[in-house]
Swiss-Prot record:
This is Proteasome activator complex subunit 2. The modification N-acetylalanine is found at A2. Implicated in immunoproteasome assembly and required for efficient antigen processing. The PA28 activator complex enhances the generation of class I binding peptides by altering the cleavage pattern of the proteasome. InterPro entries: PA28_C, PA28_C_sf, PA28_N_sf, Proteasome_activ_PA28, Proteasome_activ_PA28_N, Proteasome_activ_sf. Belongs to the PA28 family. It comes from Sus scrofa. The modification Phosphoserine is found at S10. GO terms for cellular component: cytoplasm; nucleoplasm; proteasome activator complex. GO terms for biological process: regulation of G1/S transition of mitotic cell cycle; regulation of proteasomal protein catabolic process. Keywords: Acetylation, Phosphoprotein, Proteasome. Residues 65-86 are annotated as: Disordered. SUPFAM superfamilies: Proteasome activator. Heterodimer of PSME1 and PSME2, which forms a hexameric ring. Residues 72-86 have a biased composition (Basic and acidic residues).
Amino acid sequence: MAKPCGVRLSGEARKQVDVFRQNLFQEAEEFLYRFLPQKIIYLSQLLQEDSLNVTDLTSLRAPLDIPIPDPPPKDDEMETDKQEKKEVPKCGFLPGNEKILALLGLVKPEVWTLKEKCILVITWIQHLIPKIEDGNDFGVAVQEKVLERVNAVKTKVEAFQTTISKYFSERGDAVAKASKETHVMDYRALVHERDEAAHGELRAMVLDLRAFYAELYHIISSNLEKIVDPKGEEKPSMY
Protein backbone atom coordinates (compact mmCIF):
# COMPACT_ATOMS: atom_id res chain seq x y z
CA MET A 1 0.00 0.00 0.00
CA ALA A 2 1.42 3.36 -1.01
CA LYS A 3 2.41 5.64 1.83
CA PRO A 4 0.61 8.98 2.04
CA CYS A 5 2.86 11.76 0.86
CA GLY A 6 2.88 15.36 1.91
CA VAL A 7 5.08 18.28 2.77
CA ARG A 8 6.32 18.08 6.31
CA LEU A 9 7.45 21.32 7.91
CA SER A 10 9.09 21.86 11.23
CA GLY A 11 7.22 23.93 13.78
CA GLU A 12 9.39 26.99 13.15
CA ALA A 13 9.13 26.70 9.36
CA ARG A 14 5.36 26.34 9.53
CA LYS A 15 5.20 29.39 11.77
CA GLN A 16 7.21 31.43 9.25
CA VAL A 17 4.93 30.31 6.41
CA ASP A 18 1.86 31.26 8.42
CA VAL A 19 3.32 34.70 9.14
CA PHE A 20 4.03 35.17 5.43
CA ARG A 21 0.44 34.21 4.56
CA GLN A 22 -1.03 36.58 7.13
CA ASN A 23 1.15 39.45 5.90
CA LEU A 24 0.20 38.62 2.31
CA PHE A 25 -3.52 38.69 3.08
CA GLN A 26 -3.17 41.96 4.98
CA GLU A 27 -1.29 43.51 2.04
CA ALA A 28 -4.02 42.33 -0.32
CA GLU A 29 -6.69 43.90 1.89
CA GLU A 30 -4.74 47.17 2.05
CA PHE A 31 -4.33 47.08 -1.74
CA LEU A 32 -8.02 46.55 -2.48
CA TYR A 33 -9.65 48.85 0.05
CA ARG A 34 -7.17 51.70 0.33
CA PHE A 35 -4.36 51.64 -2.21
CA LEU A 36 -6.47 51.02 -5.33
CA PRO A 37 -8.97 53.88 -4.90
CA GLN A 38 -6.22 56.30 -3.89
CA LYS A 39 -4.07 55.36 -6.87
CA ILE A 40 -6.94 55.86 -9.32
CA ILE A 41 -7.52 59.34 -7.87
CA TYR A 42 -3.80 60.16 -7.99
CA LEU A 43 -3.43 59.11 -11.64
CA SER A 44 -6.51 61.13 -12.57
CA GLN A 45 -4.88 64.17 -10.97
CA LEU A 46 -1.59 63.43 -12.69
CA LEU A 47 -3.34 63.44 -16.06
CA GLN A 48 -4.42 67.03 -15.38
CA GLU A 49 -0.82 68.22 -15.03
CA ASP A 50 0.41 70.69 -17.66
CA SER A 51 3.37 68.45 -18.46
CA LEU A 52 1.00 65.76 -19.72
CA ASN A 53 -1.24 68.14 -21.65
CA VAL A 54 1.16 69.80 -24.05
CA THR A 55 -0.63 70.94 -27.21
CA ASP A 56 2.33 72.56 -28.94
CA LEU A 57 4.63 69.57 -29.34
CA THR A 58 7.40 71.73 -30.75
CA SER A 59 7.83 73.13 -27.24
CA LEU A 60 9.11 69.71 -26.21
CA ARG A 61 12.14 69.95 -28.45
CA ALA A 62 15.50 69.97 -26.72
CA PRO A 63 18.34 72.04 -28.20
CA LEU A 64 20.84 69.99 -30.19
CA ASP A 65 24.31 71.45 -29.80
CA ILE A 66 25.56 69.91 -33.01
CA PRO A 67 27.59 72.26 -35.25
CA ILE A 68 26.38 72.66 -38.81
CA PRO A 69 29.30 72.24 -41.23
CA ASP A 70 30.25 74.85 -43.81
CA PRO A 71 28.87 74.34 -47.30
CA PRO A 72 31.11 72.29 -49.63
CA PRO A 73 33.73 74.31 -51.54
CA LYS A 74 33.39 75.18 -55.21
CA ASP A 75 35.07 73.07 -57.85
CA ASP A 76 37.97 75.49 -58.37
CA GLU A 77 38.61 75.66 -54.65
CA MET A 78 38.61 71.90 -54.47
CA GLU A 79 41.32 71.76 -57.12
CA THR A 80 43.61 74.20 -55.33
CA ASP A 81 42.99 72.87 -51.85
CA LYS A 82 43.02 69.13 -52.47
CA GLN A 83 45.47 68.53 -49.70
CA GLU A 84 43.69 70.77 -47.22
CA LYS A 85 40.73 68.80 -45.99
CA LYS A 86 38.58 70.47 -43.42
CA GLU A 87 37.55 68.29 -40.52
CA VAL A 88 33.88 67.97 -39.66
CA PRO A 89 33.10 70.09 -36.59
CA LYS A 90 32.90 67.97 -33.48
CA CYS A 91 30.07 68.31 -31.02
CA GLY A 92 30.47 68.13 -27.28
CA PHE A 93 28.28 66.70 -24.55
CA LEU A 94 24.71 66.08 -25.72
CA PRO A 95 22.26 65.82 -22.80
CA GLY A 96 18.88 64.13 -22.99
CA ASN A 97 15.57 65.92 -23.26
CA GLU A 98 14.97 67.31 -19.77
CA LYS A 99 11.20 67.61 -20.24
CA ILE A 100 10.84 63.99 -21.32
CA LEU A 101 13.22 62.82 -18.60
CA ALA A 102 11.10 64.64 -16.01
CA LEU A 103 8.00 62.84 -17.27
CA LEU A 104 9.82 59.53 -17.18
CA GLY A 105 10.71 60.27 -13.58
CA LEU A 106 6.98 60.40 -12.83
CA VAL A 107 5.77 57.51 -14.98
CA LYS A 108 8.49 54.87 -14.51
CA PRO A 109 7.85 54.40 -10.77
CA GLU A 110 4.13 54.02 -11.49
CA VAL A 111 4.84 51.28 -14.02
CA TRP A 112 7.02 49.41 -11.53
CA THR A 113 4.42 49.83 -8.78
CA LEU A 114 1.59 48.35 -10.85
CA LYS A 115 3.79 45.41 -11.85
CA GLU A 116 4.55 44.70 -8.19
CA LYS A 117 0.89 45.00 -7.24
CA CYS A 118 -0.04 42.51 -9.97
CA ILE A 119 2.46 40.07 -8.46
CA LEU A 120 0.88 40.70 -5.05
CA VAL A 121 -2.63 39.92 -6.32
CA ILE A 122 -1.45 36.83 -8.20
CA THR A 123 0.34 35.47 -5.12
CA TRP A 124 -2.64 36.25 -2.90
CA ILE A 125 -5.15 34.42 -5.12
CA GLN A 126 -2.80 31.47 -5.58
CA HIS A 127 -2.74 31.06 -1.79
CA LEU A 128 -6.54 30.98 -1.77
CA ILE A 129 -6.90 28.17 -4.31
CA PRO A 130 -8.30 25.16 -2.39
CA LYS A 131 -7.25 21.55 -2.55
CA ILE A 132 -8.08 20.10 -5.95
CA GLU A 133 -10.87 17.53 -5.56
CA ASP A 134 -14.25 16.55 -6.96
CA GLY A 135 -17.13 18.84 -6.17
CA ASN A 136 -18.14 22.43 -6.68
CA ASP A 137 -15.22 23.99 -8.56
CA PHE A 138 -17.05 27.03 -9.91
CA GLY A 139 -15.30 29.29 -7.44
CA VAL A 140 -11.93 27.90 -8.50
CA ALA A 141 -12.81 28.66 -12.13
CA VAL A 142 -13.51 32.25 -11.08
CA GLN A 143 -10.14 32.42 -9.36
CA GLU A 144 -8.45 31.15 -12.51
CA LYS A 145 -10.23 33.72 -14.68
CA VAL A 146 -9.19 36.55 -12.39
CA LEU A 147 -5.61 35.25 -12.35
CA GLU A 148 -5.66 35.12 -16.14
CA ARG A 149 -6.72 38.75 -16.37
CA VAL A 150 -4.23 39.98 -13.77
CA ASN A 151 -1.44 38.17 -15.62
CA ALA A 152 -2.56 39.87 -18.83
CA VAL A 153 -2.32 43.27 -17.13
CA LYS A 154 1.14 42.39 -15.81
CA THR A 155 2.27 41.46 -19.33
CA LYS A 156 1.06 44.78 -20.72
CA VAL A 157 2.84 46.68 -17.95
CA GLU A 158 6.06 44.84 -18.75
CA ALA A 159 5.64 46.02 -22.34
CA PHE A 160 5.63 49.59 -20.99
CA GLN A 161 9.05 48.96 -19.48
CA THR A 162 10.27 47.79 -22.88
CA THR A 163 8.82 50.90 -24.52
CA ILE A 164 10.70 53.15 -22.09
CA SER A 165 14.00 51.37 -22.73
CA LYS A 166 13.35 51.52 -26.46
CA TYR A 167 12.95 55.30 -26.27
CA PHE A 168 16.50 55.75 -24.99
CA SER A 169 17.87 53.33 -27.58
CA GLU A 170 16.08 54.95 -30.52
CA ARG A 171 16.79 58.50 -29.42
CA GLY A 172 20.42 57.63 -28.80
CA ASP A 173 20.73 56.22 -32.30
CA ALA A 174 19.12 59.32 -33.79
CA VAL A 175 21.43 61.66 -31.85
CA ALA A 176 24.46 59.60 -32.86
CA LYS A 177 23.49 59.82 -36.52
CA ALA A 178 22.80 63.55 -36.26
CA SER A 179 26.21 64.16 -34.68
CA LYS A 180 27.98 62.00 -37.26
CA GLU A 181 26.13 63.12 -40.38
CA THR A 182 26.00 66.77 -39.37
CA HIS A 183 24.95 67.92 -42.83
CA VAL A 184 21.78 65.76 -42.85
CA MET A 185 19.01 67.80 -41.27
CA ASP A 186 16.58 64.89 -41.27
CA TYR A 187 18.52 63.19 -38.48
CA ARG A 188 18.09 66.27 -36.31
CA ALA A 189 14.38 66.26 -37.09
CA LEU A 190 14.27 62.56 -36.18
CA VAL A 191 15.50 63.35 -32.67
CA HIS A 192 12.69 65.88 -32.19
CA GLU A 193 10.12 63.49 -33.64
CA ARG A 194 11.19 60.80 -31.16
CA ASP A 195 10.77 63.18 -28.24
CA GLU A 196 7.33 64.27 -29.39
CA ALA A 197 6.25 60.66 -29.84
CA ALA A 198 7.58 59.79 -26.38
CA HIS A 199 5.36 62.43 -24.79
CA GLY A 200 2.28 60.88 -26.36
CA GLU A 201 3.39 57.40 -25.33
CA LEU A 202 3.91 58.46 -21.72
CA ARG A 203 0.49 60.10 -21.50
CA ALA A 204 -1.08 56.97 -22.96
CA MET A 205 0.76 54.89 -20.36
CA VAL A 206 -0.73 56.91 -17.52
CA LEU A 207 -4.19 56.52 -19.06
CA ASP A 208 -3.65 52.77 -19.31
CA LEU A 209 -2.28 52.51 -15.77
CA ARG A 210 -5.39 54.20 -14.42
CA ALA A 211 -7.60 51.93 -16.51
CA PHE A 212 -5.75 48.83 -15.30
CA TYR A 213 -6.17 49.84 -11.65
CA ALA A 214 -9.87 50.47 -12.24
CA GLU A 215 -10.20 47.08 -13.93
CA LEU A 216 -8.41 45.32 -11.07
CA TYR A 217 -10.70 47.01 -8.57
CA HIS A 218 -13.79 45.99 -10.51
CA ILE A 219 -12.83 42.39 -11.22
CA ILE A 220 -11.61 41.70 -7.67
CA SER A 221 -14.45 43.44 -5.81
CA SER A 222 -17.09 41.91 -8.10
CA ASN A 223 -15.78 38.38 -7.54
CA LEU A 224 -14.39 38.75 -4.02
CA GLU A 225 -16.72 36.17 -2.48
CA LYS A 226 -15.66 33.44 -4.93
CA ILE A 227 -12.00 34.48 -4.75
CA VAL A 228 -11.70 34.18 -0.96
CA ASP A 229 -14.17 31.29 -0.54
CA PRO A 230 -14.27 29.32 -3.82
CA LYS A 231 -16.02 26.30 -2.26
CA GLY A 232 -18.67 28.33 -0.46
CA GLU A 233 -17.83 26.59 2.80
CA GLU A 234 -16.87 29.55 4.95
CA LYS A 235 -17.91 33.13 5.48
CA PRO A 236 -16.08 35.24 2.85
CA SER A 237 -13.09 37.10 4.22
CA MET A 238 -9.94 38.62 2.81
CA TYR A 239 -8.04 36.29 5.13
